[in-house]
């Protein structure tokens, strides 16, 4: 019986290992293929059957920086993303704290806030474009930052409220009894306790803003787009420049992966808050 039990346990481990290997392959193969495409010649990319062994080249990256000036589009994305993340966290954190501990109608107000997030972006595309046109804000950082902040605030409030809810209300009551103001309670007591959750929220907002495409398409032109939108320019009447597409996709995805990797400790900490009592 002992031998049978050990064999069964070993078989299960092997099956689980095989399952996770297959799942990892499914997720990683598209990204790996994209990276390889950036280092291929255009002919190698469209050859049939596909070539897994090829002579690496930096022609795609050279085309990006010397012909298209892709670096300025990355700077556009970086400016919009960094400012948007800072503003979203700065606005959402106090609001989430208030909904969690200050007001007694936090649940009702949260539902009202989330209703704004339910509306699909394409439904407000025309009004946003008309408003930006009348205010002369097309092709500006301000327009992209404002719309990204407005779109991501409901999600950030919803997520951070759950983190603040994990802090026992007696801490706030004790601080208030000792003479602390609400702002002091928020900045000196609550924020350090939910820092992991706030940073986890910042990661999600960073990814959402960096990859945002719809409003960048509506509010910018071919003169000053963000990096994801600029990749449309590699589709010409003669075909798609796959080497440039692969190189651009690699450059666009690298900051997101690097940021998530750097913040992974806080990301896991934030997402597991309250899971252990």
UniProtKB/Swiss-Prot annotation:
A GO BP entry: transmembrane transport
InterPro entries: BP-dep_ABC_trans_perm, MetI-like, MetI-like_sf
Residues that span the membrane, as ranges: 15-35, 79-99, 109-129, 140-160, 189-209, 213-233, 242-262
Protein topology in the membrane: Multi-pass membrane protein
Pfam families: BPD_transp_1
Domain ABC transmembrane type-1: 74-263
Single GO cellular component term: plasma membrane
CDD domains found in the cross-reference section: TM_PBP2
Keywords for the protein's UniProt record, in alphabetical order: Cell inner membrane, Cell membrane, Membrane, Plasmid, Transmembrane, Transmembrane helix, Transport
Major location category of this protein: membrane
Subcellular localization: Cell inner membrane
Record carries keyword Cell membrane: yes
Gene3D superfamilies named in the record: MetI-like
Keyword Transmembrane helix among record annotations: yes
Family affiliation: Belongs to the binding-protein-dependent transport system permease family. MalFG subfamily.
Biological role: Probably part of the binding-protein-dependent transport system y4oPQRS. This system probably transports a sugar-like molecule. Probably responsible for the translocation of the substrate across the membrane.
Protein name: Probable ABC transporter permease protein y4oR
């Amino acid at each position: 019986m002992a031998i049978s039990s050990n064999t069964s346990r070993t078989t299960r481990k092997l099956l689980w290992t095989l399952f996770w290997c297959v799942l990892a392959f499914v997720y990683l193969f598209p990204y790996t293929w994209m990276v390889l495409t950036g280092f291929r010649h255009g002919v190698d990319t469209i050859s049939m059957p596909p070539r897994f062994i090829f002579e690496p080249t930096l022609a795609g990256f050279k085309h990006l920086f010397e012909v298209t000036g892709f670096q300025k589009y990355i700077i556009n994305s970086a400016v919009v993303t960094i400012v948007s993340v800072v503003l979203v966290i700065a606005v959402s954190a106090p609001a989430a704290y208030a909904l969690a501990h200050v007001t007694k109608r936090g649940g009702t107000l949260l539902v009202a806030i989330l209703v704004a997030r339910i509306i699909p972006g394409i439904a407000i595309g025309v009004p946003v474009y008309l408003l930006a046109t009348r205010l002369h804000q097309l092709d500006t950082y301000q327009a992209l930052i404002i719309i990204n902040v407005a779109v991501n605030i409901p999600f950030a409030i919803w997520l951070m409220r759950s983190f603040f809810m994990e802090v026992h209300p007696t801490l706030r009551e004790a601080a208030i009894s000792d003479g602390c103001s609400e702002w002091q309670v928020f900045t000196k007591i609550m924020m350090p306790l939910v820092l992991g959750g706030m940073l986890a929220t910042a990661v999600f907002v960073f990814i959402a803003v960096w990859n945002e495409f719809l409003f960048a398409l509506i509010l910018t032109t071919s003169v000053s787009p963000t990096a994801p939108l600029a990749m449309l320019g590699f589709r010409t009447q003669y075909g798609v420049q796959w080497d440039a597409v692969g190189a651009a996709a690699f450059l666009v995805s690298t900051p997101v992966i690097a940021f998530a990797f750097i913040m992974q400790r806080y990301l896991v900490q934030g997402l597991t808050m309250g899971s252990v009592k």
